[in-house]
Amino acid sequence: DEEGCLTFAKGYPYKESHRHFSHAMAIHPLGLIDWSDGEKSQHIIRATLKRLDEVGPDYWTGYSYSWLANMKARAFDGEGAAQALKTFAECFCLKNTFHANGDQTQSGKSRFTYRPFTLEGNFAFAAGIQEMLLQSHTGVIRIFPAIPKEWKDVSFESLRAMGEFLVSAR
């Protein structure tokens, strides 16, 4: 759109809170628009993420936060990615760690408070952590690309990078 945000289609901007960010799939998971592509792509990514924040999470579900974490990690925003994952874990998961879609704590992070169990939120959560630790979707392996300041002692072993590489780092 005129502000640089991704839209659903020409003339159909993201203007109402919704649990799916299908208009932003080019950022994640597809990686068709990537931070490393330069200023124009960075502007699109920043504007799209800003719009998500501005419209707000009224009708998001837990996996919306997991997906947001992946997109924030792709934008090298470790603080934002960590906050989204924290919200997912604290507000949208049951004590057994199952994702229950709705805000189980009624914290105001979503108007949905229902409990349908779905796995995609948990899978996206795990993917978000990996995106924070290791990215390789562009053909370049980046280690610790989106680590928040509070993660002072970070390491991982045998994460899989594109090209069948196993990577470990401290």
State the predicted function of each range:
Residues 1-140, 151:
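Active-site core of glycosidic bond-cleaving carbohydrate-active enzymes
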Residues 142-170:
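Surface beta-strand/loop "capping" patches
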